[in-house]
Amino acid sequence: MRDEVESPEELLGLARSGPVALLVVGDPMQATTHIDLEDRCVDEGIGFHVIPGLTATALAVSLSGLQSYRFGRQVTIPFSVGEYLPTSPLQMIRDNRDSGLHTLVLLDLDPTGMGVEEPRPMVPGEAVALLERMSQRSEGD
């Protein structure tokens, strides 16, 4: 279904001729894909109604017991694919720390970087190793 939402011509065609429902887990407006779909509906005069849901990120912040307004930007630690290893996640964590803010760190689910294999959750030890590599890379720049 992801392809149909990211390239929504068929979905929009159905919506032009009758009611269509798209059910997603969590808050749909936290995904740029769903924001794009909403924008297309507005542009084409297609009526829509969004019912926000509870997101895993909001739940994680709530369950942490920390004050939600003390969180900075959330960060995703991506798997390293080939030579690809961005240092921006580490920099965002540092920026949040320097501003006295907590960081909600999400761990990647796609070891291929292309969505061609079954999702595999990154484990915390992998995330730590990747952060260490990011640190070494950023020191070398």
Indicate where each model-derived feature is located:
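Glycine-rich beta-strand-to-loop/alpha-helix junction loops that act as flexible
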Residues: 24-27, 52
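Active-site/ligand-binding-proximal alpha/beta "capping" segment
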Residues: 27-30, 34-43
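A short acidic, glycine/proline-enriched capping/turn motif at secondary-structure boundaries
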Residues: 4-5, 27-30, 56-57
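Short beta->alpha connector loops at strand-helix junctions that form conserved
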Residues: 1, 52-53
